[in-house]
């Protein structure tokens, strides 16, 4: 019993809660749905019940606001009676498209009990009775905020196209809209799903500014549920199609808020975009900004523009509702079920102007698309500056073709994210399209500026962005196919070219071929082993070194003269065609620098003229590939400094005799290899700004120099001390002109040059002792010229093998490469009679070069040996001197001590005394023994003693 007392009141409490929940969920009145589907031939239209989420969240007993003109209450009992009944016979054709809306979208707004109750109510219905869901979209300025739809007003409309088999429906208009025209929805009861989902190919524009996205799959046709969508209020889209302005834009699959089923008719003065297509094409991956291609429809279009109605510069206005009405097809056509829908784009700026006429030759059908542009918009304006969509209702009528064919009209579906994108849709008057294969051109603009779509077959694009060209098949092949336009996107800086670029792309290979391989003897003069391209007209002048065709000239070119052309750079690979060239003239061109590989391949070159160009910089070891070079003319350029290694080469430039550097703003010479050129005899540095330090280095280090040309001011300074200089160094002669002798020239170096004890005079004295070559110094003399040589560094297998075989014989890598190349040339190319003379010269020069190099090596070796012997001799001499010095020092020390003689004498005396003592002792012992013997004899014979 205790359990019964505990559970007894529970059903009552539960029933009270459920009753409150039902009262809260039950709407006050059954409001007519914003989209009223009316079947004209089948009977009067019956209202659909709107979900309670469309109503404001307020008390059921709250007083209703007073009726305004155009409101439901204002319309009287006839209007209210239509809102009181539930729908009894929903349209069968729309049921399949509406039954998945409940599962496709989730209602993010409203209380949870009301959502659950209302969802259960809809789930209990049959699939034919299910109601479309309207999900409010989150406001742009408020994240996850509740958005209430405006109050709706109902306007009585006339029946449109009450033909058999068609159905016209009405869409309610918000009360705050300035235009009371309702949205109309005309539905064909047959093949709606098939025609909309499969046959209408909609090229899409997905505006995704400020973000690049690339889909992983191709964009497919929208699901059937979305094609059957009756009302496109902000909340009516499923979550995957909703776009939050605060979130970064996603990939193109996440379609933006608004979808415009509009014919792409646009003419933008800033951007023109042509799309001609008549076949099923795969959609290109989406990029930064996606533009709809120009559709080449098989119908004639007429789009008279209606007068504007209101200003589009406001920042907060009612939604822009596009009203689309579709005419019924002919008797022999398949039924086209074209929906009329209302679109509410967010923060999309649109300008639409009309096109009078488009003519095609494939089919003859007409489409009328009256567009109602915004009021007070400037004629030249391409974008409308609005934050909220304008309160306009452009009405577009798109009747299908009256031909019984499988071709379908091309519609442009513009899907734009609410990110302040400016869309301009204009058209070109009178566009003629032929059924022959066309060129599809698509133009892309940077993000955020106005987007233009222009259906123009031939395009002149003034924008800097370029066009992408493809070929479309013949329209006859499309009659059995569904026309599907490619979704074209592209970063604005990646696409290139317009129609002119097509010509350039076709002619560029020809020009490149002509510039790299051509019959040069038709343009220039060929003969006597000379190629001369001098005196050409400005249009014929060369811009790079030409490469002759193999059979252009029967012989070799030993002299190349390209003087007075427009050559601005040198490619080392081009010289392989002139492997026997000995003289190269490139004066009066537009060279600005000399890279290291500028003359790679001119192995036998002897004469090089680079005068009167615009050379500013010479890379290190530029002349290393010219071992036999005798003459270099670098005059009349813009050289200000000779950097370290300019004349550095493994071969030491043994044959360079003449070097001209005049008429350059040269101030600094940092390359010591210039002063150490072993064979340099003529150096012209006139009209430069060299210093006295450079002159000292030349006089000190350039051993074989015979003639030196100096700037006039420096030469005249030296001429003031002509007698003193020639007296100090007899190997230096000054040739002074009359101007230097008669005119008094200020000489900044006078103090250092005129001082007999100065550095300059000491340098001349050192030159006199070490150099015997007579040096003549002049002022601003004209340059000499001489030269001859040729080239060709190869890299074939034979040369590589020779290099490997010479590794053990020649340790120097540069010399080894040079010798292997010479051997390869003598083996492979010298078999022909017309090059035998050049081969003989090559052998002589190679032998001379090797001789000079070997002499230098021997001289270095002798110097090293002499240095070693000298070091040994010096070491020995130093040691001997050190020993002698030590002995002298010891003897001096002995002499300096006073008791040394006394000690020696004492030692001598002691030794003598000892010897004398020993002798005395021995004598004494002898005497003692003699006396003993005498006494013994006397004792034995006494008679002897008595007698």
Swiss-Prot record:
Record region (Disordered): 42-88, 226-257, 294-458, 484-514
Biased composition (Polar residues): 311-320, 404-415, 436-445, 495-507
Location(s), subcellular: Membrane
Transmembrane segments: 906-926
UniProt keyword list: Coiled coil, Glycoprotein, Leucine-rich repeat, Membrane, Repeat, Signal, Transmembrane, Transmembrane helix
Cellular component, GO annotation: membrane
Domain of life of the native organism: Eukaryota
SUPFAM superfamilies with a match to the protein in the record: L domain-like
Main subcellular location: membrane
The UniProt record lists the keyword Lyase: no
Bilayer topology annotation: Single-pass type I membrane protein
Coiled-coil stretches: 867-897
Range of residues in the leader sequence: 1-27
Glycan attachment positions: 358, 789
Extracellular side: 28-905
Cytoplasmic topological domain residue ranges: 927-947
A matching Pfam family: LRRC37AB_C
Annotated LRR repeat ranges: 556-577, 580-601, 604-625, 628-649, 655-676, 679-699
Family matches, as PANTHER family: LEUCINE-RICH REPEAT-CONTAINING PROTEIN 37A (PTHR23045), LEUCINE-RICH REPEAT-CONTAINING PROTEIN 37A-RELATED (PTHR23045:SF19)
Protein name: Leucine-rich repeat-containing protein 37B
Organism: Homo sapiens (Human)
């Amino acid at each position: 019993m205790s359990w019964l007392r505990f559970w007894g009141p529970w059903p009552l409490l539960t029933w009270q809660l459920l009753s409150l929940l039902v009262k809260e969920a039950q709407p006050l009145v059954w409001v007519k749905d914003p989209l009223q589907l009316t079947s004209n031939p089948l009977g009067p239209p019956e209202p659909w019940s709107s979900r309670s989420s469309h109503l404001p969240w307020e008390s059921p007993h709250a007083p209703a606001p007073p009726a305004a003109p155009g409101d439901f209450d204002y319309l009287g009992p006839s209007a209210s009676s239509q809102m009181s009944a539930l729908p009894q016979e929903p349209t069968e054709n729309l049921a399949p498209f509406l039954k998945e809306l409940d599962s496709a979208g989730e209602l993010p707004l409203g209380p949870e009990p009301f959502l659950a109750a209302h969802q259960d109510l809809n789930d209990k219905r049959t699939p034919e009775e299910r109601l479309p869901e309207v999900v409010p979209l989150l406001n742009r300025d408020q994240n996850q905020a509740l958005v209430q739809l405006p109050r709706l007003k109902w306007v009585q409309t006339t029946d449109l196209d009450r033909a058999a088999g068609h159905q016209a429906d009405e869409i309610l208009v918000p009360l705050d809209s300035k235009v009371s025209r309702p949205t109309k929805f005309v539905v064909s009861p047959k093949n709606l799903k098939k025609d909309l989902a499969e046959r209408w190919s909609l090229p899409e524009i997905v505006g995704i500014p400020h973000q690049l996205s690339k889909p992983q799959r191709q964009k497919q046709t929208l699901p059937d549920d979305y094609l059957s969508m009756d009302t496109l209020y902000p909340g009516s889209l499923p979550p995957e199609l909703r776009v939050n302005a605060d979130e970064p834009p996603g990939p193109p699959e996440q379609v933006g808020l608004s979808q415009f089923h509009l014919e792409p008719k646009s003419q933008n003065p800033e951007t023109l975009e042509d799309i001609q297509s008549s076949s099923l094409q795969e959609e290109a991956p989406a990029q930064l900004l996606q533009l709809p291609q120009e559709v080449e429809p098989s119908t004639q279009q007429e789009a008279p523009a209606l007068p504007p109605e209101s200003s589009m510069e406001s920042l907060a206005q009612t939604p822009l509702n596009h009203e689309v009405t579709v005419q019924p097809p002919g008797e022999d056509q398949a039924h086209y079920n074209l929906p009329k829908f209302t679109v509410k784009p967010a923060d999309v700026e649109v300008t639409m102007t009309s096109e009078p006429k488009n003519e095609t030759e494939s089919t003859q059908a007409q489409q009328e698309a009256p567009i109602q542009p915004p009021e007070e918009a400037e004629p030249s304006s391409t974008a409308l500056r609005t934050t909220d969509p304008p309160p306009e209702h452009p009405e577009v009528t798109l009747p299908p073709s009256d031909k019984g064919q499988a071709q379908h009209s091309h519609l442009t579906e513009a899907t734009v994210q609410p990110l302040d994108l400016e869309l301009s849709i204009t058209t070109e008057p009178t566009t003629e399209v032929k059924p022959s294969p066309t060129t599809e051109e698509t133009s892309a603009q940077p993000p955020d500026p106005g987007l233009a779509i222009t259906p123009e077959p031939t395009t002149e694009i003034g924008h800097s962005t370029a066009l992408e060209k493809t070929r479309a098949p013949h329209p006859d092949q499309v009659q059995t196919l569904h026309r599907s336009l490619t979704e074209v996107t592209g970063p604005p800086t990646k696409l290139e070219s317009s129609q002119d670029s097509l010509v350039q792309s076709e002619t560029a290979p020809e020009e490149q071929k002509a510039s790299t391989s051509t019959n040069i003897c038709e343009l220039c003069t060929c003969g006597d082993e000379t190629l001369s391209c001098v005196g050409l007209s400005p249009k014929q002048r060369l811009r790079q070194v030409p490469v002759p065709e193999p059979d252009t000239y029967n012989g070799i070119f030993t002299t190349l003269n390209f003087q007075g052309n427009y050559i601005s750079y040198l490619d080392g690979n081009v010289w392989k065609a002139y492997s026997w060239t000995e003289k190269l003239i490139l004066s009066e061109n537009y060279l600005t620098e000399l890279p290291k590989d500028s003359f790679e391949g001119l192995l036998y070159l002897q004469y090089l003229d680079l005068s009167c160009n615009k050379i500013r910089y010479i890379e290190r070891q530029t002349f290393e590939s010219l071992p036999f070079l005798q003459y270099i003319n670098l005059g009349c350029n813009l050289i200000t400094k000779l950097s370290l290694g300019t004349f550095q080469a493994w071969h030491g430039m043994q044959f360079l005799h003449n070097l001209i550097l005049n008429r350059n703003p040269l101030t600094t010479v940092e390359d010591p290899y210039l002063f150490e050129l072993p064979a340099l005899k003529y150096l012209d540095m006139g009209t430069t700004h060299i210093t006295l330090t450079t002159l000292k280095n030349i006089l000190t280090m350039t051993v074989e120099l015979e003639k030196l040309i100096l700037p006039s001011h420096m030469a005249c300074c030296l001429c003031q001390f002509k007698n003193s200089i020639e007296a100090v160094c007899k190997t230096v002669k000054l040739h002074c002109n009359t101007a230097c002798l008669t005119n008094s020239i200020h000489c900044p170096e006078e103090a250092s040059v005129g001082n007999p004890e100065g550095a300059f005079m000491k340098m001349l004295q050192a030159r006199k002792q070490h150099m015997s070559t007579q040096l003549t110094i002049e002022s601003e003399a004209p340059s000499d010229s001489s030269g001859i040589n040729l080239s060709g560094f190869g890299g074939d297998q034979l040369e590589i093998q020779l290099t490997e075989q010479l590794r053990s014989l020649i340790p120097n890598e540069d010399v080894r490469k040079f010798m292997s190349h010479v051997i390869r040339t003598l083996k492979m190319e010298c078999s022909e009679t017309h090059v035998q003379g050049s081969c003989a010269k090559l052998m002589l020069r190679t032998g001379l070069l090797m001789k000079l190099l070997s002499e230098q090596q021997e001289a270095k070796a002798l110097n090293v040996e002499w240095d070693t012997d000298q070091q040994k001799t010096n070491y020995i001499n130093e040691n001997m001197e050190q020993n002698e010095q030590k002995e002298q020092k010891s003897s001096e020390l002995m002499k300096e001590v006073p008791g040394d003689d006394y000690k020696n004498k004492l030692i001598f005396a002691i030794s003598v005394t000892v010897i004398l003592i020993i002798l005395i002792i021995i004598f004494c012992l002898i005497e003692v023994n003699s006396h003993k013997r005498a006494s013994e004899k006397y004792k034995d014979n006494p008679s002897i003693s008595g007698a």
